[in-house]
Amino acid sequence: MNIVNTIKDVRLIIKKWKDENLSIGYVPTMGYLHEGHTSLIKKAREENDKVIVSIFVNPIQFGPKEDYSTYPRDLVKDSSLCEKFGVDLIFNPETSEMYPNKIYSHINVDILTENLCGEKRPGHFQGVCTVLTKFFNILNPTKAYLGEKDAQQLAVVKKMVEDLNFPIEIIGCPIIREEDGLAKSSRNAYLNKQERKSALILNKSLKEALKALESGEKNLNNIKDIIVSKLNKEPLAKIDYVSIVDSITLQSVEKIQSSILVAIAVYIGKTRLIDNFTFKL
């Protein structure tokens, strides 16, 4: 397995692979890898000749009061995990490699970024789309693998790839959970013992909502109320948003047409966690 830090070097490797007509699966990450990431790597390994993982904590997708400086990093552990799961190449550029000068060009995806995390984290998806556009141009992958836990990000990136004619297939992979139901996240590392226990309220509230939908509840305001009521019973939980949107357009819906995304963002102490599920008629 190679670990490469420069765009020049990674392009030389990619060119060789492309000359040999090899397919490339790409997993973009910010590092501090967990089982959610390794599920993406395994899928990429199954479907491609070569697998690349990028590890880059992207500064332009963090707001001024967010956790860029404290975001967990552990390249040694990440490298070991990547090697274990058959990754061929880790691309781990410095910030100065990705952004050597002040950046004037940004990628925005309208409409899909107007609510959910896009509303609560202004500029976040512009940063995500800009860095992924750079990575797609540098790495030229056949397929890219993203987790469904970040459902809005997945929808936004799919639309960006469609609109800008990137010759890349975007593959969404299911949420991976701890045994007790908490969605795997690098930010779970911030939680102390009590907060970790309290964080289970996210999945519990969504489970109640899903159960109501499966039992025939069609009033989406009632579904929201079920989630809010459950979350409010947890003292350490502070709701950022509870939203029900069309799973493709991410626009708010008043009734279920075909497929809905039920998404929540909740602060447990100072840590912001997200979770979701999709429900189809």
UniProtKB/Swiss-Prot annotation:
Cite the entry's keywords alphabetically: ATP-binding, Cytoplasm, Ligase, Nucleotide-binding, Pantothenate biosynthesis
Q: Where does ATP bind?
A: 30-37, 147-150, 176, 184-187
- The Enzyme Commission number assigned here is 6.3.2.1
Location in the cell reads: Cytoplasm
Kindly list the GO CC terms recorded for this protein: cytosol
GO MF entry, a single one: ATP binding
Q: Which reaction does it catalyse?
A: (R)-pantoate + beta-alanine + ATP = (R)-pantothenate + AMP + diphosphate + H(+)
Q: Which GO terms describe its biological process?
A: pantothenate biosynthetic process
Pathway participation: Cofactor biosynthesis; (R)-pantothenate biosynthesis; (R)-pantothenate from (R)-pantoate and beta-alanine: step 1/1
Q: What class of enzyme is it?
A: ligase
- Chain positions recorded as beta-alanine binding sites: Q61
Binding residues for (R)-pantoate: Q61, Q153
Q: Does the keyword Transport apply?
A: no
What SUPFAM superfamilies is this protein classified in?
Nucleotidylyl transferase
Q: Which superkingdom heads the taxonomic lineage of this protein's source? A: Bacteria
Q: Which residues form the active site?
A: H37
Per the entry, what this protein does is: Catalyzes the condensation of pantoate with beta-alanine in an ATP-dependent reaction via a pantoyl-adenylate intermediate.
* Similarity remark: Belongs to the pantothenate synthetase family.
Complexes and interactors: Homodimer.
Additional remarks: The reaction proceeds by a bi uni uni bi ping pong mechanism.
Q: What is this protein called?
A: Pantothenate synthetase
Source organism per UniProt: Clostridium botulinum (strain ATCC 19397 / Type A)
